């Protein structure tokens, strides 16, 4: 099953992968046609950027710019896990996650899901979006599809969303509190702030 999923990603196709609490559509982050297909499957509005998954902390340095010691500390402490970092992307990156390259930033994490981590270590960065229509609830069962390969590990346990930290220069701001609390993050990065409502 893993080999078929890997082959599909390398061919520029969309697959279904499990995360901690839901299934997602996934594809090679550098394949524009695959990223476009991913957004079509979800009926995403124009300009929506996919999130990125990587298989290890070390990959981040090649994708993001302006990595500070605090960002690296957060990544090492909470990855694999439920921390999403929203970072300025490396200027040399040749990808379009669905925003036409206008955002100049991307959201990334290393998931704590062993089967998916095995895939990521062989594929490099993948673009993902929830395996459902935009705005719908996350899915805990892998959607049945004859058109795409699926790494189906059965029903997943529903759970909280990841916590999202936005990075702007030296400033770290929690823009969504999810599985990780603000207090947990502040123990690692004391200067982190909580976005005002």
Residue ranges, per PLM feature:
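Active-site-adjacent structural elements in enzyme catalytic cores
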Residues: 1-197
């Amino acid at each position: 099953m893993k080999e078929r999923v890997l082959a599909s990603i390398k061919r520029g196709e969309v697959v279904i992968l499990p995360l901690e609490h839901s299934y997602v559509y996934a594809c090679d982050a550098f394949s524009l046609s695959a990223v476009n297909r991913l957004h079509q499957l979800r009926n995403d509005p124009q300009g929506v950027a996919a999130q990125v998954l990587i298989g290890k902390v070390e990959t981040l340095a090649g994708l993001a710019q302006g990595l500070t010691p605090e960002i690296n500390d957060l990544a090492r402490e909470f990855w694999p896990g439920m921390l999403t970092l929203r970072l300025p992307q490396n200027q040399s990156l040749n990808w379009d996650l669905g925003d036409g390259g206008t955002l100049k930033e991307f959201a990334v994490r290393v998931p704590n899901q062993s089967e998916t981590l095995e895939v990521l270590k062989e594929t490099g960065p993948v673009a993902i979006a929830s395996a459902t229509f935009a705005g719908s609830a996350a899915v805990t069962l892998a959607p049945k599809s004859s058109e795409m390969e699926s790494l189906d590990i059965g029903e997943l346990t529903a759970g909280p969303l990841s916590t999202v930290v936005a990075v702007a220069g030296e400033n770290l701001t929690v823009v969504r509190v999810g599985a990780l609390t603000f207090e947990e993050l502040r123990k690692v990065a004391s200067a982190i702030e909580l976005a005002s409502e």
